[in-house]
A protein has these predicted regions:
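Class I S-adenosyl-L-methionine
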Residues: 104-127
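Conserved Class I S-adenosyl-L-methionine
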Residues: 90-111
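Mid-chain, well-packed structural core segment of small domains
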Residues: 58-93
């Protein structure tokens, strides 16, 4: 299995929603081997959004809130590391966690995807 997909706990959920993926993740998207959507068209067990700004993160959270199939669905936001030489962002782990908490999500797991990207997994908070 692709090492990034393994880190993201991908277990064959289908279809998958991937939002705003940078070009260097083309190979990872191809490794999914399931239908991959880049715009929400239903319900998903696995959603991955790439955000370089707070506004992008909030937009992805709003899409995910409607698109996640159920409480077991996996939702990740990938964001540039502070040490990235390629990307600039106004996000980090703590600010992303606090921001999405306001939209009904709780950050539960953090992984490093590569030298430029980290990802934080969120679960919907039951209301």
């Amino acid at each position: 299995m692709n090492p990034i997909l393994k880190k993201l706990q991908f277990k064959g959920q289908s279809p998958v929603l991937v939002l705003a993926a940078p070009a260097e993740f083309k190979e990872t998207k191809a490794a999914l081997e399931v239908p991959v959507h880049v715009a929400a068209k239903g319900r998903y067990g696995f959603v991955l959004g790439f955000a370089k700004s707070r506004a992008e993160a909030v937009a992805h959270a709003k899409v995910a809130k409607k698109a996640l199939a159920d409480q077991r669905s996996v939702f990740w936001i990938a964001y540039p590391k502070g040490s990235s030489k390629k990307y600039q962002a106004d996000l980090n782990r703590d600010s992303l966690h606090a921001l999405l908490e306001q939209h009904g999500f709780d950050g539960v797991s953090l992984v490093a995807l590569d030298e430029d990207w980290s990802a934080l997994r969120f679960k919907q908070v039951e209301t």
